[in-house]
Amino acid sequence: MRVAVVRSTLHKASGQTVHIGQLTKRLRDRGVDIKVFAREAFGDISPIEPVEVKFRGSGLRFIRHFGFMAKCGTQIKDFDLVHTQYHPGIFVGNFVRALRGIPHVFTFHGYAPIRGWTNPSQKLKMIDHSLGTFFALHAGIDKVIAISQYIKGLLTRFYQVDEAKISIVYNGVDLERFHPLRGSSDIWKKYGIDGPTVLYVGRMAPYKGVQHLIKAIPLVLEVCPDTKFVIAGGTRFDRVKLTQSMLSRIRHALVFTGYLPDEEIPRLYSACDVFCYPSMWEGFGLTPAEAQAAARPVVAFNHCAIPEVVVDGKTGILARPADHKGLAAGIIQLLRDSEMRVRMGLDGRKRMEALFSWDLAAERTLEVYRQILE
């Protein structure tokens, strides 16, 4: 079986890049002859070496998308299946299907709501992606893979996709990379931290909800004054706004790491006492899954796909959406109860092993491929 996987850009530190890298590696291990086509490849998906699709005239977004689609049409041939991810990859799959008759499967990760962005260009980008995907979903797709039940619901309700066309294949976790590590707490010396730690890993985009964690911090410090809050990841979008308007009283308890080497992330998960993920929208929730693989309890909001990944009262504590007081209460409860932290952490690890391995994701993806080709 020969499969062409298409995503226009493989971003560094992107959940979708992780998805493609982990999935293609395991599909290759199962005998699939797989190639990844991308216009730009900043992220690492080794051992797979992406095929960079080069073309001239890549200034305007529309020109880039059209050029990428046309060039892929000349390069993707003699494949049994084309598997696309995101926008504008979905158009490539439709084009190749029309041009060469190659069946097309599309994995839908979802788009963060327009209201979740403050940057006007990001709002326009999400509108463009959502509308484009809506029309593309009805113009030449054999199967759609949803990464969660929540995403399947979006596909049937808002994108009007026939339920019979949809298969759910959950994302996975690299269980060999993310697991409990002895001596990991030594990493806090680098940041001058000595005491309980609450960790967030991710971007600073508004919909990721860091502002709700910031609001929760004073409430936590009233009860657990020695707690440190580590914000690990990118600083794009609203960091300056957050720092000026909300951080003055709690600056002493905050540590911003910025982007980190990949090898440090598993140590951070293992070293923290509580992982907090206050995101206001998730199609799956990869970082909470990684934290649970490292046997750490999670505090998050009870909406979107998060309840599919974090079980309230068993592997973490889920608060009402946008309820910073509920977020604080969950963090405090875990910081004050070490037995609960250990129990939830171990249950989280077991659940990740049972339901969310990349090997299982690869097997289920292979089942979808076979259904299409039968």
Task: Tell me the role of every PLM-derived stretch.
Residues 241-263:
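Nucleotide-activated donor-binding/catalytic signature segment of Leloir-type glycosyltransferases, i.e.
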Residues 125-144:
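Membrane-proximal helix-turn-helix segments that form the acceptor-binding/catalytic region
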Residues 280:
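Aromatic "clamp/platform" in nucleotide-sugar-dependent glycosyltransferases that forms part
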Residues 259-260, 267-272:
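Short alpha-helical donor nucleotide-sugar binding micro-motif in glycosyltransferases
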